[in-house]
Amino acid sequence: MTRVLHILDHSLPLHSGYTFRTRAILKSSQSAGIEVCGITGNRHLAQGPPVETVDGLTFHRTATRLSSPPIIREWQEIEALRAGIERVAKEWRPDIIHAHSPALCGMAGLRAAHRLGMPFVYEIRAFWEDAAVGNGTGSEGSIKYRLTRALENRVVAKADAVFTICNGLRDDLVSRGHDGNKIVLSPNGVDLTLFGHPPARDETLAASIGIGSGPVIGFIGSFYDYEGLDDLI
């Protein structure tokens, strides 16, 4: 049976779009007969044991706490996670290392995979440097922005295969000169079985708030420019 070790920024029991997508990927893999295990980096800040099982999924933690200056701290994060990956891999014996963005996880997974002689795949859910610009925590063209992009370019170039969450990310990577033949689309999806049987439309409520009889699109999420809500509207 194939075993895949997933390298993650954070995971369940924390709740975020990131952790819910991770859960869906791991659960679908299990349904396909693939054994899965995860390890999180230093940015998983929830309190818990070194090894934690949540919803039938096992996650190893990287407990190192760092206080070095920027850039040095990020490299220490990579090395701490790399060491954790190698430790788990030597015990659990995975067949593939699958790292999920950000690039810090990608570089840690890449370095560990090369040292262990294992196949390495990288999944990009967003360009985190652009997300930082969108939410106001970063600026385009800054040193941090350029270093983050350079690091991710390195990971993408060296990965055996790359997954992106949408065609826009794939097209961007190809425009940078990366091989499009190794970049595969892995979009978000919805497992309708998790929702049971939805209740019938409440016509009284719809009328009271002026919705009318047409279709209704609801959005639950963050209100950042990069979400594309203006396009939806």
PLM feature segments, named:
Residues 1-64:
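N-terminal subdomain of nucleotide-sugar transferases
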Residues 196-211:
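A short helix/loop element that forms part of the nucleotide-sugar donor recognition site in Leloir-type
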Residues 3-7, 211-227, 233:
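Conserved donor-binding/catalytic core segment of Leloir-type glycosyltransferases
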Residues 97-118, 122-131:
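An aromatic- and histidine-rich active-site surface loop
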Residues 77-81, 119-121, 129-154:
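Nucleotide-sugar donor phosphate/pyrophosphate-binding loop at the beta->alpha transition
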Residues 168, 189:
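Carbohydrate-associated surface elements
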Residues 157-166:
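A short beta-strand/loop micro-motif in the catalytic core of glycosyltransferases
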Residues 57-83, 136-143:
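A short, charged, and often flexible helix/loop element on the N-terminal side
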